């Protein structure tokens, strides 16, 4: 059983948010934290999600169907991009808040965090928001290949102390942690991956 990702639908406005009966795991993080690269690593494909060096490139809510497990990974717009207009930032903040609070199928928030950086206020705010609304967190440290082993361990401990959950260390380029992340995402969605099916293809 190979795991595959398919971009099934895209939403740009509140009205376009569709209700899917299947479980959903939201992917959120600061602009340029590496969400698109992580989606591609999970899919085992290089071009499923568009990757850009320009912060804030993802400006939509993208619903990726995970087969054959039948749940969605929902890629939310990156936040914290200072060059975006105030009205644009406000628009996406409202979209994010409505999705996180009104989607009955949402099972967890996968919060992407740059392994190289200290905890950022916007990340802390989103983690607190999720916890205040009873939304389970799956913290993910991205770009772990840029840090040495001591730095990785320190960052994991730091975030575990903050959110109460040890983050999954990942690297999209080396595929570090991708198999474990699939297990964590599936568990959060309420499904099980048998050992022979861990690798995304």
UniProtKB/Swiss-Prot annotation:
<dbReference type="InterPro" id="IPR019987">
    <property type="entry name" value="GTP-bd_ribosome_bio_YsxC"/>
</dbReference>
<feature type="binding site">
    <location>
        <position position="36"/>
    </location>
    <ligand>
        <name>Mg(2+)</name>
    </ligand>
</feature>
<keyword id="KW-0132">Cell division</keyword>
<dbReference type="GO" id="GO:0046872">
    <property type="term" value="F:metal ion binding"/>
</dbReference>
<dbReference type="GO" id="GO:0000917">
    <property type="term" value="P:division septum assembly"/>
</dbReference>
<feature type="binding site">
    <location>
        <begin position="29"/>
        <end position="36"/>
    </location>
    <ligand>
        <name>GTP</name>
    </ligand>
</feature>
<feature type="binding site">
    <location>
        <begin position="75"/>
        <end position="78"/>
    </location>
    <ligand>
        <name>GTP</name>
    </ligand>
</feature>
<feature type="binding site">
    <location>
        <begin position="56"/>
        <end position="60"/>
    </location>
    <ligand>
        <name>GTP</name>
    </ligand>
</feature>
<dbReference type="InterPro" id="IPR030393">
    <property type="entry name" value="G_ENGB_dom"/>
</dbReference>
<feature type="domain" description="EngB-type G">
    <location>
        <begin position="21"/>
        <end position="191"/>
    </location>
</feature>
<keyword id="KW-0479">Metal-binding</keyword>
<comment type="similarity">
    <text>Belongs to the TRAFAC class TrmE-Era-EngA-EngB-Septin-like GTPase superfamily. EngB GTPase family.</text>
</comment>
<comment type="function">
    <text>Necessary for normal cell division and for the maintenance of normal septation.</text>
</comment>
<keyword id="KW-0342">GTP-binding</keyword>
<keyword id="KW-0547">Nucleotide-binding</keyword>
<dbReference type="Pfam" id="PF01926">
    <property type="entry name" value="MMR_HSR1"/>
</dbReference>
<protein>
    <recommendedName>
        <fullName>Probable GTP-binding protein EngB</fullName>
    </recommendedName>
</protein>
<feature type="binding site">
    <location>
        <position position="58"/>
    </location>
    <ligand>
        <name>Mg(2+)</name>
    </ligand>
</feature>
<keyword id="KW-0131">Cell cycle</keyword>
<dbReference type="GO" id="GO:0005829">
    <property type="term" value="C:cytosol"/>
</dbReference>
<feature type="binding site">
    <location>
        <begin position="168"/>
        <end position="172"/>
    </location>
    <ligand>
        <name>GTP</name>
    </ligand>
</feature>
<dbReference type="GO" id="GO:0005525">
    <property type="term" value="F:GTP binding"/>
</dbReference>
<feature type="binding site">
    <location>
        <begin position="142"/>
        <end position="145"/>
    </location>
    <ligand>
        <name>GTP</name>
    </ligand>
</feature>
<dbReference type="InterPro" id="IPR027417">
    <property type="entry name" value="P-loop_NTPase"/>
</dbReference>
<dbReference type="InterPro" id="IPR006073">
    <property type="entry name" value="GTP-bd"/>
</dbReference>
<keyword id="KW-0717">Septation</keyword>
<keyword id="KW-0460">Magnesium</keyword>
């Amino acid at each position: 059983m190979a795991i595959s990702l398919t971009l099934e639908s895209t939403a740009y406005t509140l009205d376009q948010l569709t209700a899917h009966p299947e479980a959903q795991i939201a992917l959120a993080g600061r602009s340029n934290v590496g969400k698109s690269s992580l989606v591609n690593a999970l899919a085992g494909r290089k071009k499923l999600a568009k990757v850009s060096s320009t912060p804030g490139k993802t400006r939509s809510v993208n619903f990726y169907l995970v087969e054959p497990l039948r749940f969605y990974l929902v890629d939310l717009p990156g936040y914290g991009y200072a060059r975006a207009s105030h009205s644009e930032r406000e628009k996406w903040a409202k979209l994010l808040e409505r999705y996180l609070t009104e989607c009955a199928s949402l099972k967890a928030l996968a919060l992407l965090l740059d392994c190289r950086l200290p905890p950022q206020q916007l990340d802390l705010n989103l983690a607190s928001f999720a916890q205040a609304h009873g939304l389970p967190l799956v913290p993910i440290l991205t770009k772990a290949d840029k840090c040495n082993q001591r730095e990785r361990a320190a960052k994991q401990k730091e975030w575990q102390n903050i959110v109460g959950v040890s983050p999954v260390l990942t690297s999209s380029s080396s595929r570090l942690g991708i198999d474990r992340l699939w297990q964590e995402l599936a568990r959060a969605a309420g499904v099980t991956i048998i050992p022979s099916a861990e690798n995304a293809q």
